Swiss-Prot record:
Spans annotated as Disordered: 1-20
Protein name as annotated: Chaperonin 60 subunit beta 3, chloroplastic
Phosphoserine: residues bearing it: 97, 474
Quaternary context: Part of the Cpn60 complex composed of 7 alpha and 7 beta subunits. Can also form a complex composed of 14 beta subunits only. Both complexes show ATPase activity. The Cpn60 complex interacts with the Cpn10 complex.
One Gene Ontology molecular-function label: ATP binding
Pfam families: Cpn60_TCP1 (PF00118)
Signal peptide: none
Factors inducing expression: Up-regulated by light.
Note: Assisted protein folding requires ATP hydrolysis, but not K(+) ions.
Transmembrane domains' residue ranges: none
PANTHER family from the UniProt entry: 60 KDA HEAT SHOCK PROTEIN, MITOCHONDRIAL (PTHR45633)
SUPFAM superfamilies per record: GroEL apical domain-like, GroEL equatorial domain-like, GroEL-intermediate domain like
Length: 597
């Protein structure tokens, strides 16, 4: 016997053909199917598979050597891209043309080594690149090279009998102290220096640097700058109305681009609700209108419960409706204010019961219009269609009045953020190239440059070209005096030696001896003096525009140190034993007789 409870709502039957009908997917089923099966039968159908493991101990140093071999293979591969004279890496693509990239983290993600222990070593260092990329958006190659240096120097002293626990503690304390020194060396970035920061990150490409600086000048430092693939061979820049906030899609099933993991719609309608949506029936009429009109729909509400969310997801996956949903940004009163800002930008009406609007009774007249919406896991960008310019101006004036009346600095800061999001608009850089392969490589460079510029705005800038890390090495001796244990001091020395690795590799990629370059740089007491690998000159790097964002250098140092500590504390590696590939069955595969002759 079987019993089934279902709550199913069918909508749009008179508005769309059967294949486009919208259905609410809410059902609970219980069945006696399978109850008669014995436990033995189930075990036979679903056998457990136990994979044997291989243990690699470090008694003779072989485990660490193999891990380090994996680290070196990845770092040597990624390292060729470092600096203004770094080379490209060609990545095989299963589908389409090969990819030619100069981006460290993109190269690192492609590396899978045949030896499982070496592969674990490569994966450890890849974490430094990925974490730096997530937080700073640039400096991934430097993170890998710095981690390689810390591991190389650390393995030497651990092999000589030093205590890895105390060594790693010394590395940790030294890194923390160096980050504090780095912040002292940092200075706030001027508008005229933004182009230099972007250009250095893009491989000394001042066309890209100037374009990013121009974009920030147009939308402000707190404005939003996005990248698109252009249709011509030239780069271009344009600015449109729009706002971005830190709220992504509620469910990954709303994604329309599985490669970028984002939901993107053009000429989209917006439905703004200042309450929780608890019942699918409340939004039936709005969804039916979207099916009938054939337009994408973005729902922004305080929250969406399981039943209405399941309705949206199922019908989106069936192709019945183009829809996405997210929770409204902010909390409490600020949430309502953000919804009003979005309404001003899009011309929507916010659904609130206190003003007499009931969710189940509203029609398409309350929907707003957006030229484009892009939702990722963490952010949403809404670009207006340009029809609400006057309303936006009035809204900005209202917020400015609130700033004058505000007493707390925190409140003023939040109000200024709202103005930037409303009036700053979205600057769109279209990256152009002659071929698709060149376009992808170029877009990665521009993306790095944009991320570096944003990082510079956040935490300031320092001298670039690997010279800041080299200068930090001179601070280590003073830091050692604060460490009580001798082996912790050895950990500090490991950091000191590793800090020269990035500059030496930049010089090597430029065809110069890295050790000679390091000595010449340190021979000058001027902290801004360094080696310009692009020109081969020793000069004032700050004046020459060779600048790095402080945030990028900090993330490189912290994440490389974290990975090195994990590596040096490892003493055993456990990997799966690869099963031999089973031989092909005997007999003619085209023979249907049932006999294997």
């Amino acid at each position: 016997m079987a019993s089934t409870f279902s709550a199913t709502s069918s909508m749009g039957s008179s508005l769309a053909p059967p294949s486009n009908r919208l259905s609410s997917f809410v059902s609970i089923s219980s069945s006696s199917f399978g109850r008669t099966q014995s436990i033995a039968q189930r075990k036979a159908r679903f056998p457990k598979i136990y994979a044997a493991k291989q243990l690699h101990f470090n008694k003779d140093g072989t485990a660490i050597k193999k891990l380090q071999a994996g680290v070196n293979k990845l770092a040597d591969l990624v390292g060729v891209t470092l600096g203004p004279k770094g080379r490209n890496v060609v990545l095989e693509s299963k589908y389409g043309s090969p990819r030619i990239v100069n981006d460290g983290v993109t190269v690192a993600r492609e590396v899978e080594l045949e030896d499982p222990v070496e592969n674990i070593g490569a994966k450890l260092v890849r974490q430094a690149a990925s974490k730096t990329n997530d937080l700073a958006g640039d400096g991934t190659t430097t993170s890998v090279v710095l981690a390689q240096g810390l591991i190389a120097e650390g393995v030497k002293v651990v092999a000589a009998g030093a205590n890895p626990v105390l060594i790693t503690r010394g590395i940790e304390k030294t890194t923390k102290a160096l980050v504090a020194e780095l912040k002292k060396m940092s200075k706030e970035v001027e508008d005229s220096e933004l182009a230099d920061v972007a250009a250095v990150s893009a491989g000394n490409n001042y066309e890209v640097g100037n374009m990013i600086a121009e974009a920030m000048a147009k939308v402000g430092r707190k404005g939003v700058v996005t990248l698109e693939e252009g249709k011509s061979a030239e780069n271009s820049l344009y600015v449109v109305e729009g706002m971005q906030f830190d709220r992504g899609y509620i469910s990954p099933y709303f994604v329309t681009d599985s490669e970028k993991m984002c939901a993107e719609y053009e000429n989209c309608k917006l439905f703004l609700v200042d309450k929780k949506i608890t019942n699918a029936r409340d939004i039936i009429s709005i969804l039916e209108d979207a099916i009938k009109g054939g337009y994408p729909l973005l729902i922004i509400a305080e929250d969406i419960e399981q039943e209405p969310l399941a309705t949206l997801v199922v019908n989106k996956l069936r192709g019945t409706i183009k829809v996405a949903a997210l929770k409204a940004p902010g909390f409490g009163e600020r949430k309502s204010q953000y919804l009003d800002d979005i309404a001003a930008l899009t011309g929507a009406t916010v659904i609130r019961e206190e003003v007499g609007l009931q969710l189940e009774k509203v029609g398409p007249e309350v929907l707003g219009n957006a030229g484009k919406v892009v939702l990722t896991k963490d952010t949403t960008t809404i670009v207006g269609d340009g029809s609400t310019e006057e309303v936006v101006k009035k809204r900005v004036e209202q917020i400015k009045n609130l700033i004058e009346a505000a007493e707390q600095d925190y409140e003023k800061e939040k109000l200024n953020e709202r103005i930037a999001k409303l009036s700053g608009g979205v600057a769109v850089i279209q990256v152009g190239a002659q071929t698709e392969t060149e376009l992808k490589e170029k877009k990665l460079r521009v993306e790095d440059a944009l991320n570096a510029t944003k990082a510079a705005v956040e935490e300031g800038i320092v001298v670039g070209g690997g010279c800041t890390l080299l200068r930090l090495a001179s601070k280590v001796d003073a830091i050692k005096e604060t460490l009580a244990n001798d082996e912790e001091k050895v950990g500090a020395d490991i950091v000191k030696k590793a800090l020269s690795y990035p500059l030496k590799l930049i010089a090597k990629n430029a065809g110069v001896n890295g050790s000679v370059v390091s000595e010449k740089v340190l021979s000058s007491d001027n902290p801004k003096h360094g080696y310009n690998a692009a020109t081969g000159k020793y000069e004032d790097l700050m004046a020459a525009g060779i600048i790095d964002p402080t945030k990028v250098v900090r993330c490189c140092l912290e994440h490389a140190s974290s990975v090195a500590k994990t590596f040096l504390m490892s003493d055993c590696v456990v990997v799966e034993i690869k099963e031999p590939e089973s031989a092909a069955p005997a007999g003619n595969p085209m023979d249907n007789s049932g006999y294997g002759f």
